[in-house]
C-alpha cells in the first residue's frame, strides 16, 4: 500500500465527519491514534523482553484490545469508550514510585490536551480499521509506511494555517544536522522542537552513518536526545514522531524553554549540540523577557531563544539554527545580542536561504547560523543560496529538495586547525573579518540577494499567504494590547 493511498483514504473518511475542520484537526486526530498504536506496540515488546514489565495503559484501553478488532465497538459506544479512555490516561499515577521509567508520565503528558474531534463513531471505526489494515509494526514495510504517512502529515502542516510554524522542511533539518556533524554520545537538544524534525534528522543521521550498531549504542542514543515544546499539538506530534523513530520514552518536556533565567542553568543541563528553528515573528510577555540580562532584554521570541542557546551550550558546544533576516540587520538590543554572540562564540557560517523556503506558511527571509561556543569569532563566511534553476519560488507543490543544497554542499569545505579549507569567495559567497562587522554596528545582513522579484502565486496559495500574515499581525497586536492592559491594571489606571 502506497503512502499516498493510505493518506488519501484517511482524509476521505474524515472529510465526511462533521467534527473535522481543516488539516490541523485532521492531523491531530490521526496522530493520537497513531501514538496509541505505536505505544501499544512498544508495550508488547517490553512484555516479551521483560518478565517483570506491567503495562502502563490499562488493559481495556490498550490499542490491541479495543481497536484491533475490525468488527469491534463502533458508533456512540466507541465515542463513549474514547472519552472514558482519555479521562483514564490523563489521570495515570506518574509519581516516581509508580512510574520510575516515566512511561505513565509520557502517556499522561501527550494526551493531556488532545481532542477527539470526530463526531461519528462509525466514521471513527473506519479510520481505525484503515490504520490497522495498512500499518503493522511487526513488518518492516509496516514501520516504513507508518513513517511515510507520518512525515507526509507533518509536511501538510506547512500549509495548515498557523500550525505551519511547527514544521521545518526536512531538507533544512537534514542540511543543518549534516554540518553540525553530531557524534553518538554527545548530548543533543532542541529547545523549540515543534514536530521533532531536527531530533529525528539526528537519529536518521546516526542510522545512515552506521553509528548505532549495538545494544549499548541504542541505549546511548535513547539517553542523549532531548527537547522542549511549549504547545500541546506539536508536542503530541513530536512524541509520536520520536516513537516512530525508535525512541522508547522521548525526553521531551512540555514547557516554555524561555521561562527560566539564563543564569540558573547548571553544568549538568548544558549540552554539546543544539539544533533548532525557534519561533520568529512572535512576542513574549514581560515576565519571559526578563529571563535574560537587562542589556539583552526584549520581547522578540527568536532573540530570546538565541540568548538562552548561548547559555545552554557547553564550551566547545555547537549550534545550527534558523533565524530571520530581522536579526541580521536589527539594531539596539539585537546589536547587543550579536556582540555577545561574536565575543563568546565562533559564528563561522551564515547561509542566506531563498525567500520562500517556508512557503506558504511564511515568506519571511530566513538564514542558517552555525557557531561554536568558547572561542570568539575571527570572521564570518556568508553564502547566498540562490533559487534553483526553473523555480521562481518554492510552494506546496514545488517544495525545497535536498538537491537544492548541492551548491552550498560543494562550497562548504572542511575545518582544519581552526580555519576553513576549500572555501572561496565568489559572487554568492563572502568572508567578512569580525573587525568589519563591529565597525558596521554588528550588521550581519551581508551577501544578501541583490534583486527582489515579485512572486505571483496561484490564487489558493495567495489567499493562504494573506490569511497567515493577517493572523500573525493580529496575534502580535493582541499580544501588545494585552501587555498594555496588564500594565494599566498594575498602575490602577
For each of these PLM feature ranges, what is it?
Residues 1-184, 253-260, 352-356, 378-386, ...:
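Non-catalytic, mostly N-terminal accessory regions of nucleic-acid modification and defense proteins
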Residues 6, 22-26, 123, 145, ...:
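Helical mechanochemical/support elements of P-loop NTPase systems and associated helical scaffolds
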Residues 22, 232-235, 298-371:
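Conserved Class I SAM-dependent methyltransferase catalytic core
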Residues 165-276, 281-283, 292, 299, ...:
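Conserved S-adenosyl-L-methionine
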Residues 223-226, 288-294, 352-354, 390-397:
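Short beta-alpha connecting loops at secondary-structure transitions
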Residues 270, 274, 364-365, 376-379, ...:
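A generic structural signal for well-ordered coil/turn residues at beta-strand boundaries
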Residues 346-347, 359-410:
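C-terminal, active-site-flanking charged/polar segments
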Amino acid at each position: 500500500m502506497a503512502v499516498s493511498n493510505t493518506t488519501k483514504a484517511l482524509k476521505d473518511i474524515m472529510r465526511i465527519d462533521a467534527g473535522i475542520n481543516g488539516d490541523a484537526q485532521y492531523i491531530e486526530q490521526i496522530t493520537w491514534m497513531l501514538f496509541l498504536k505505536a505505544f501499544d506496540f512498544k508495550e508488547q515488546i517490553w512484555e516479551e523482553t521483560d518478565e517483570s514489565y506491567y503495562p502502563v495503559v490499562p488493559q481495556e484501553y490498550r490499542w490491541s484490545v479495543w481497536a484491533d478488532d475490525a468488527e469491534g465497538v463502533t458508533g456512540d459506544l466507541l465515542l463513549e469508550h474514547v472519552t472514558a479512555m482519555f479521562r483514564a490516561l490523563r489521570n495515570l499515577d506518574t509519581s516516581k514510585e509508580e512510574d520510575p521509567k516515566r512511561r505513565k508520565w509520557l502517556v499522561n503528558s501527550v494526551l493531556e490536551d488532545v481532542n477527539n474531534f470526530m463526531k461519528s463513531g462509525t466514521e471513527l471505526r473506519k479510520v481505525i480499521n484503515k490504520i490497522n489494515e495498512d500499518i503493522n509494526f511487526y513488518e518492516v514495510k509496516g514501520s516504513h509506511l507508518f513513517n511515510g504517512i507520518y512525515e507526509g502529515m507533518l509536511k501538510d502542516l506547512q500549509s495548515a494555517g498557523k500550525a505551519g510554524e511547527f514544521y521545518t522542511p526536512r531538507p533544512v533539518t537534514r542540511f543543518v544536522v549534516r554540518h553540525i556533524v553530531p557524534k553518538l554520545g554527545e548530548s543533543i537538544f532542541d529547545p523549540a522542537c515543534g514536530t521533532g524534525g531536527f531530533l529525528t534528522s539526528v537519529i536518521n543521521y546516526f542510522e545512515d552513518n552506521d553509528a548505532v550498531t549495538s545494544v549499548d549504542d541504542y541505549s546511548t542514543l535513547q539517553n542523549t536526545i532531548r527537547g522542549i515544546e511549549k504547545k500541546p499539538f506539536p508536542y503530541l506530534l513530536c512524541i509520536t514522531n520520536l516513537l516512530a523513530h525508535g525512541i522508547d520514552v522521548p525526553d521531551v518536556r512540555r514547557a516554555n524553554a524561555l521561562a527560566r533565567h539564563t543564569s540558573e542553568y547548571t553544568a549538568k543541563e548544558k549540552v554539546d549540540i543544539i539544533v533548532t528553528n525557534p519561533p520568529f515573528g512572535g512576542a513574549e510577555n514581560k515576565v519571559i523577557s526578563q529571563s535574560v540580562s537587562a542589556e539583552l532584554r526584549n520581547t522578540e521570541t527568536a532573540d530570546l531563544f538565541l540568548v538562552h542557546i548561548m547559555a545552554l551550550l557547553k564550551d566547545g558546544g555547537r549550534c545550527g539554527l534558523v533565524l530571520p533576516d530581522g536579526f541580521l540587520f536589527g539594531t539596539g538590543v539585537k546589536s547587543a545580542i550579536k556582540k555577545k554572540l561574536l565575543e563568546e562564540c565562533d559564528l563561522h557560517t551564515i547561509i542566506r536561504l531563498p525567500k520562500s523556503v517556508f512557503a506558504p506558511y511564511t515568506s519571511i527571509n530566513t538564514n542558517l547560523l552555525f557557531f561554536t561556543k568558547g572561542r570568539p569569532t575571527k570572521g564570518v563566511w556568508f553564502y547566498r543560496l540562490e533559487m534553483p534553476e526553473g523555480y521562481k519560488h518554492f510552494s506546496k507543490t514545488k517544495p525545497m529538495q535536498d538537491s537544492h543544497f548541492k551548491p552550498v554542499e560543494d562550497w562548504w569545505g572542511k575545518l582544519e586547525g581552526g580555519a576553513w579549507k576549500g572555501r572561496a569567495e565568489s559572487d554568492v559567497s563572502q568572508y567578512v573579518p569580525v573587525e568589519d562587522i563591529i565597525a558596521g554596528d554588528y550588521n550581519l545582513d551581508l551577501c544578501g540577494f541583490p534583486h527582489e522579484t515579485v512572486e505571483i502565486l496561484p490564487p489558493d496559495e495567495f489567499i493562504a499567504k494573506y490569511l497567515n500574515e493577517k493572523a500573525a499581525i493580529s496575534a502580535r497586536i493582541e499580544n501588545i494590547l494585552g501587555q498594555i492592559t496588564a500594565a494599566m491594571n498594575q498602575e490602577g489606571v
